[in-house]
A protein has these predicted regions:
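Conserved mixed alpha/beta catalytic, RNA-binding, or beta-rich assembly cores of soluble enzyme
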Residues: 1-188
């Protein structure tokens, strides 16, 4: 496992190289997190450079997550990515979604949020990898029961890559993390 010195966007290119190389070697789909779309052009460029011809799925926030009726990822960018062969998934966060609404209203914490925060003990990106993999599976963008390479981050960019077999959110504890290829150190 490669351990980056710190979290952040400066790890993006190396994380994506690891993700695509591993996916190519193993014949796996790649699922990446994207908020505003900045990581997608980088992964497409590196995929071409490295000869990765497999499926790329970009998972972004649900509509209304920041502003009602809108998505953070602009519709033009979504279409541009689709035109380049990327499957774009917009969905509620698998490890918060409706539970976050309950915890805000009733000032508590609920089981799925506990799972999310437990995964964050390995870093924000590890939580994101598990979450986007389940979101992609729930949407039908990836095949059930197959390993994938998931790429997450801690804010902007990518800094965590996991090889995992996701489960549907209705059976989230069945998700298996087989390998963490890279992640940032959590040293302060």
């Amino acid at each position: 496992m490669l351990l980056f010195e710190k979290v952040g966007v400066e790890n993006t290119e190396k994380a994506l190289e690891l993700a695509l190389s591993s996916a190519k070697e193993r014949g796996l789909d790649v699922v990446i997190a994207t908020t505003g779309g900045g990581t997608v052009p980088v992964v497409l460029e590196l995929a071409k450079k490295l000869g990765y011809e497999g499926k790329i799925v970009a998972v972004t926030h649900a509509f209304g997550s920041r502003e009602k009726g809108k998505n953070i990822l602009e519709p033009e960018k979504m279409q541009e990515f689709r035109d380049k062969g990327v499957t774009v998934v917009t969905a509620a966060h698998a490890l918060s979604g409706a539970e976050r609404g309950l915890s805000k209203k009733f000032s508590g914490i609920y089981p799925v949020e506990i799972v999310a925060n437990t995964l964050k003990m390995l870093g924000q990106g590890t939580k994101v990898c598990v979450e986007i993999a389940m979101m992609a599976l729930d949407s039908g963008a990836i095949d059930y029961g197959k390993q994938i390479i998931a790429v997450g981050g801690s804010g902007r960019g990518a800094d965590t890559v996991c090889r995992l077999t996701p489960e549907y959110t209705s059976d989230l504890m069945g998700t298996k993390i087989h390998e963490i290829l890279c992640k940032p150190s959590l040293e302060e």
